[in-house]
Amino acid sequence: MKTLDEFIVEKQAEYPNAKGALTGILSSIRLVAKIIHRDINRAGLSNDILGYAGNQNVQGENQMKLDVFANDTFKRALMAREEVAGFASEEEDDFVAFDTERGRNARYIILTDPLDGSSNIDVNVAVGTIFSIYRRISPVGTPVTLEDFMQPGHKQVAAGYVVYGSSTMLVYTTGNGVNGFTYDPSLGVFCMSHENLQIPSTGRIYSINEGQYLKFPMGVKKYIKYCQEEDKATNRPYTSRYIGSLVSDFHRNMLKGGIYIYPNATNYPNGKLRLLYEGNPMAFLAEQAGGLANDGYNRILDIEPLELHQRVPFFVGSKEMVKKANEFMRDYPE
């Protein structure tokens, strides 16, 4: 069985001029995933990592203890890499420039949601980690700047997520398809389990927080009703499945076919998910797996970021389902 390390080295060998920078970064992400996996698996046995940390992040959201732990673990691991010039996280107010000689001469920056769905930890529901890798655009030899992090998603060189569920799985792309690796704790390695993942072109699952229904745009309300209607020709009604962890909902829909929607709403006029930490990496993965991702109208990967913690409405998943949802958004403008 092929391991993640073997796969990365094999892919690197296909590019004679590759210097192994991405290999090193992915090795650090793999290590962080193993550390977070370990701590999540003992969450019920230790009060040190359960519950709230007593702080709020820049979005005004209460941070869980594991949010802080995962963020700090990510930051320390990346600071140790000579390939990484800086880091931005959903849990940090601002980006972090690794202002050392090694950091100033590095060529890559990382953006991450270190622990997506962390409010589920206390009730033993799957959570995840999301990451995104870009080449810096500021001059090598200087500290990274805000502009390095404000790049549109189509400039990503790699993106992925780790889902911590009944098993721990790392899924990533470098722009040449999507592959998944399941962690074998007895060996301490990630093994190839899902090669060349493809999202089915359609499915029977829609994932949306229907408790917010009254706050949604009319186009989304109409699409939900469409999903609930009986129609044998289109295999409706569809099944509603919503975990509350983007990684978990996205992962299920990628394997089984479906659509995930977190739209704008009266309480979140610009959407809730973060473009840079959640939207762009998941959109990159979706497109590489044959799916679609947009804000209801426009391709996510073409959006020019205006703020580090910018929010965005998010429609992602099976191509035909996203297209149908987009039709309702166009037909019922606000």
UniProtKB/Swiss-Prot annotation:
InterPro entries: FBPase_C_dom, FBPase_class-1, FBPase_N, FBPtase, Fructose_bisphosphatase_AS. Gene3D superfamilies: 3.40.190.80, Fructose-1,6-Bisphosphatase, subunit A, domain 1 (3.30.540.10). It catalyses: beta-D-fructose 1,6-bisphosphate + H2O = beta-D-fructose 6-phosphate + phosphate. It holds the Pfam family FBPase. One of its GO terms (biological process) is gluconeogenesis. Its cofactor is Mg(2+). Mg(2+) 1 binds at E90, D113, L115. Mg(2+) 2 binds at D113, D116, E278. Its EC number is 3.1.3.11. It comes from the Bacteria. This is Fructose-1,6-bisphosphatase class 1. It comes from Actinobacillus succinogenes (strain ATCC 55618 / DSM 22257 / CCUG 43843 / 130Z).
